[in-house]
């Protein structure tokens, strides 16, 4: 197999003078060789096999070392010819490889060379070889000997043989010469020459030191015999540096690299494409550098599993820009891939310089993380109600608390599309809010009002849930009239950061009046969202108590003819459209005796007071209260002008209080009275669906989400006959949110119950700054309710009692009176504790009857037998004993077998169980499970257990099964009492042939009786005949 071409070697500087001396000697030797041509020709003829290695120029054999020792050429030939030469021919060819120079040199000293001696070539050559072999001169001086190129060409002309062929004649001649060597061939051995021969022997050392596997420098291709020499060379020349980072043009073109280094020799750009950190986008030259970077920075933990998105570095985006992006980012989960071009074109252009790898189609890893942070509210979103969360843990808590994961998984097809606030809806809202106030009793067109309310309230919910306050304020400004743009601009700025009322809001907006209303709407809607989130962090909001406890102002009225804002948890990213239903209703004053609205919480107070403060100035006009009620303000539509807001009267405050309380409670009969401010009574009491303000919606949402965790509290004035009606409504309308029905009833004094409604204590901030506190505050102070707690406490209580409240209760049979049923259940429990026939097998939770355990333990102890050495060994209970236990206790044979197998397994594995220790030592200790006393022998243990049981084990078989069946008949009597007579009659009508003795039920087949005994009474089917009788026999 031909070898690779290699470059000519570079000589070390230390050998230059020696080579010059040798070249001068070689010229003289050439002249002598030409004189004695016959000997040289014979020498050359026999030298073919070795000279072909020596004489091949750099183009033929490539590079050899500056030490052209004979062993190197021999081993080259050895490597190519698979070591065909023998040891003898190795030595002879080593000597011959000097190529005639040494031979002629020695002939000059030992013989007189005459031209006629050319015919005696065989004898002369034998003597010459013998002299050369015995002399160590060749091995000492010929180590660094190298022929010049001209001398090689001369030798080439003398060598007529083909260089690639193996010279069989030379091989045979060498072997014959080796056999005829004289004894003086080893007479003058040299230590150096013997070591050199030992190193050059391919038979002993293999190919480690041959020329084919010299230690080579990769940069200059110099070859060395030892690794130490190569190391010294690389340290001196600096060739040890890896040249992977250099371009191909800097490397020698003829240098061929092994195939395994192909990956590392890729272009730098290609390598950077592959060796790239997916998080920060840095490129690396080697896999080791990338690994070190990943381990140090822990970026391997942050590699996102997302498709590439436009590169936006998180370091470049300020919080203000992030807020802008939050406002402009897509709203629905269906369209999370929004356009970033408008808000972030400059950032993207600047960041293109940072991410040099963008031209390869890769994206900076930081953009993934920033994109996730930016769209986190879209990703961590409840699919049921649309609430957003900061962390996955918060979303999980919300799903668990509200039970939304059940609704999402069960109703994936209920996803709705997002409602967009179109310009038409904006116009409708404006026209609705600007309606003339003289028209209060006119019927509203249901279609217009429905669409208006739907669009506006949906938009409000969507915005508040998305927590995009800037966009919210923008929409508000579009919808609001020109009068309120300026006063509302200031107070709405703080609500970008705080969505609850603060002291500054009250101070800044005390003049306009609409700011408190708007801030309170933000408060309520955010509170609804937080309540739906399930895990609100109350400390995160500066003045949430203020938002819930506004009690210093007077209460505004709520007209009867407003709309119902029916809030349900939405299935997508927002609340459902809050469906309005308009009815024509007169302005009727409400009675205040309706105490059953006991769920009047602090939330109702804040809303009332805020609206009251806005409209307390002129309490005489009631005209605009119908169209500009809290429903309009809650929709974030245009708030009425100053003149309209000041028309709310104190008499309608009572209506408002009654309405809110009743709606918060649950659907209740509301009792309109005939008292208006002018004293005229309106007889039209048509049933209508009054407005539910955001606080009522909050209560209903909490009730719906938290599983009605709080029962309505009965206030002292709850003794009216309407309480039973309330309870009926409460039971019948669990599915319905808030649909109060107006029914005529008797009227009571408004002042009786108003004093119990509101409480003035624990007020965090004073909401009546720069306001007049005349009659309104005095009225509010008179309304107190000691049993009421803060809204936050109520919500916290709801969450606390959530697991108990959501646990399904067994439906009680309506046919059995409650008292009788309770007595039967108690009796049933007493009987079943006496004899546990209804077993609940719950794994490791022990539901064993202690009496059954004592019987089993006694039987097991009686089965132990004692050896002659006094040790006790295990034995098994026979089928007869098991049958006796099964008949007496009612346990199935399977249960008994499992208990015995478990006990024996524990004894074999650990040497003891609960009632038996040290069984592995042969001297057991028995423990009583009732009194924990210890016994050494089975007999004393059994007698002790019999004292607990009240009978002896040998008498257990004599005890009749009838005694047990009497007890079980007690149980069956209780259970059959709960069965409907129709099913019993139906069973009796069928062709029943078999009857269960234990419960008196009849069955058609024996198989049915066996199943019944096994499942109901835990009886083994093997002895079912004891408990079954034929109906015909009776």
From Swiss-Prot:
There is a cross-link at residues 188, 306, 315, 417, 461, 480, 497, 601, 652, 800, 820, 966 (Glycyl lysine isopeptide (Lys-Gly) (interchain with G-Cter in SUMO2)). One of its GO terms (biological process) is regulation of transcription by RNA polymerase II. Residues 841-911 bind DNA. Sumoylated. A zinc finger (C2H2-type) spans 215-239, 275-299, 380-404, 926-948, 994-1017. Keywords: Coiled coil, Developmental protein, DNA-binding, Homeobox, Isopeptide bond, Metal-binding, Nucleus, Phosphoprotein, Repeat, Repressor, Transcription, Transcription regulation, Ubl conjugation, Zinc, Zinc-finger. PANTHER family: TEASHIRT HOMOLOG 2, TEASHIRT-RELATED. This is Teashirt homolog 2. It comes from Homo sapiens (Human). The gene is TSHZ2.
């Amino acid at each position: 197999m031909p070898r690779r071409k290699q470059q000519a070697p570079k000589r070390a500087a230390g050998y230059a003078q020696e080579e010059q001396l040798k070249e001068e000697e070689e010229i003289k030797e050439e002249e002598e060789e030409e004189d004695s041509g016959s000997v040289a020709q014979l020498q050359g003829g026999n030298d073919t096999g070795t000279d072909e290695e020596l004489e091949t120029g750099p183009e033929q054999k490539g590079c050899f070392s500056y030490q052209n020792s004979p062993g190197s050429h021999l081993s080259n030939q050895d490597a190519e010819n698979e070591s065909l030469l023998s040891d003898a021919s190795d030595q002879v060819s080593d000597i011959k490889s000097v190529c005639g120079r040494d031979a002629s040199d020695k002939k000059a000293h030992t013989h007189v060379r005459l031209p006629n001696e050319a015919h005696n070539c065989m004898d002369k050559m034998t003597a010459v070889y013998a002299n050369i072999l015995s002399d160590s001169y060749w091995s000492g001086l010929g180590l660094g000997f190298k022929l010049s190129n001209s001398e090689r060409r001369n030798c080439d002309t003398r060598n007529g043989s083909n260089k690639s062929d193996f010279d069989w004649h030379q091989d045979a001649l060498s072997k014959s010469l080796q056999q005829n060597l004289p004894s003086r061939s080893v007479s003058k051995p040299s230590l150096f020459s013997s070591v050199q021969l030992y190193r050059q022997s391919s038979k002993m050392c293999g190919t480690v030191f041959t020329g084919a596997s010299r230690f080579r420098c990769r940069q200059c291709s110099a070859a060395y015999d030892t690794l130490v020499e190569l190391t010294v060379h690389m340290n001196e020349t600096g060739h040890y540096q890896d040249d992977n980072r250099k371009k191909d043009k800097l490397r020698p073109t003829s240098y061929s690299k092994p195939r395994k280094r192909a990956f590392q020799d890729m272009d730098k750009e290609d390598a950077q494409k592959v060796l790239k950190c997916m998080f920060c986008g840095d490129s690396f030259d080697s896999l080791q550098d990338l690994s070190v970077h990943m381990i140090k920075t822990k970026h391997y933990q942050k590699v996102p599993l997302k498709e590439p998105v436009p590169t936006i570095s998180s370091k470049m985006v300020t919080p203000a820009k992030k807020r802008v992006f939050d406002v402009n980012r897509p709203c629905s989960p269906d369209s999370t891939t929004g356009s970033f071009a408008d808000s972030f074109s400059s950032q993207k252009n600047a960041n293109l310089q940072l991410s040099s790898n963008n031209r390869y189609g890769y994206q900076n890893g930081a953009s993934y993380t920033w994109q996730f942070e930016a769209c986190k509210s879209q990703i961590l979103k409840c699919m049921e109600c649309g609430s957003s969360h900061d962390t996955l843990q918060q979303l999980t808590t919300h799903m668990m608390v509200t039970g939304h994961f059940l609704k999402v998984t069960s109703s994936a097809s209920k996803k709705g599309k997002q409602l967009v606030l179109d310009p038409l809806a904006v116009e409708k809202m404006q026209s609705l809010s600007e309606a003339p106030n003289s028209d209060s009793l006119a019927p509203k067109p249901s279609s217009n009002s429905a669409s208006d309310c739907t669009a506006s309230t949906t938009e409000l919910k969507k915005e508040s849930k998305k927590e995009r306050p800037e966009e919210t304020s923008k929409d508000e400004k579009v919808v609001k009239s020109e009068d309120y743009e300026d006063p509302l601009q200031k107070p709405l700025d703080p609500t970008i950061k705080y969505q609850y009322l603060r002291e500054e809001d009250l101070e800044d907006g005390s003049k306009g009046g609409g700011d408190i209303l708007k801030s309170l709407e933000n408060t309520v809607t955010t509170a609804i969202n937080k309540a739906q989130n399930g895990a609100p962090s109350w400390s995160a909001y500066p003045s949430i108590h203020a938002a819930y406890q506004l009690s210093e102002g007077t209460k505004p009225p709520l007209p009867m003819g407003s709309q119902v804002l029916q809030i349900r948890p939405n299935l997508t990213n927002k609340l459902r459209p809050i469906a309005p239903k308009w009815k024509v209703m007169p302005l009727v004053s409400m009675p205040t005796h309706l105490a059953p609205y006991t769920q009047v919480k602090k939330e109702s107070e804040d809303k009332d007071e805020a609206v009251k403060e806005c409209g307390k100035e002129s309490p005489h006009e009631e005209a605009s209260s119908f169209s500009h009620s809290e429903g309009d303000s809650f929709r974030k539509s245009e708030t009425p002008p100053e003149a309209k807001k000041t028309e709310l009267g104190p008499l309608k405050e009572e209506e408002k209080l009654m309405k809110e309380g009743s709606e918060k409670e649950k659907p209740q009969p509301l009792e309109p009275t005939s008292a208006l401010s002018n004293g005229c009574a309106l007889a039209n009491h048509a049933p209508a669906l009054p407005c539910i303000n955001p606080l009522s919606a909050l209560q209903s949402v909490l009730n719906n989400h938290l599983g009605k965790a709080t029962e309505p509290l009965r206030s002292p004035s709850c003794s009216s006959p309407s309480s039973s009606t309330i309870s009926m409504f409460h039971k019948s309308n669990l599915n319905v949110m808030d649909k109060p029905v107006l029914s005529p009833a008797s009227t009571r004094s408004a002042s009786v119950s108003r004093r119990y409604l509101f409480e003035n204590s624990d007020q965090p901030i004073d909401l009546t700054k720069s306001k007049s506190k005349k009659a309104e505050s005095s009225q509010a102070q008179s309304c107190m309710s000691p049993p009421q707690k803060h809204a936050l406490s109520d919500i916290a209580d709801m969450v606390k009692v959530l697991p108990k409240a959501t646990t399904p209760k067994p439906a009680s049979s309506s046919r059995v009176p409650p008292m009788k049923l309770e007595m039967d259940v108690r009796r049933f429990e007493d009987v079943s504790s006496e004899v546990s026939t209804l077993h609940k097998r719950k794994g490791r939770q022990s539901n064993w009857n202690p009496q059954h355990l004592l019987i089993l333990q006694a039987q097991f102890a009686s089965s132990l037998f004692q050896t002659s050495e006094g040790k006790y060994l295990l034995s098994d209970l026979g089928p007869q004993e098991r049958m006796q236990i099964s008949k007496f206790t009612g346990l199935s044979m399977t249960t008994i077998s499992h208990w015995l197998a478990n006990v024996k397994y524990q004894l074999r594995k650990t040497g003891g169980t609960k009632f038996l220790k040290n069984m592995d030592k042969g001297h057991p200790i028995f423990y009583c499970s009732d009194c924990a006393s210890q016994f050494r022998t089975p007999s004393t243990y059994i007698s002790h257990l019999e004292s607990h049981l009240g009978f002896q084990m040998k008498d257990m078989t004599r005890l009749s099964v009838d005694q047990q069946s009497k007890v079980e008949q007690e149980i069956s009597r209780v259970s059959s009492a709960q069965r409907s007579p129709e099913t019993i009659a139906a069973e009796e009508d069928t062709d029943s042939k078999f009857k269960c003795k234990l419960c008196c039920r009849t069955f058609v087949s024996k198989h049915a009786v066996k199943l019944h005994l096994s499942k109901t009474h835990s009886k083994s089917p093997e002895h079912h005949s004891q408990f079954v009788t034929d109906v015909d026999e009776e």
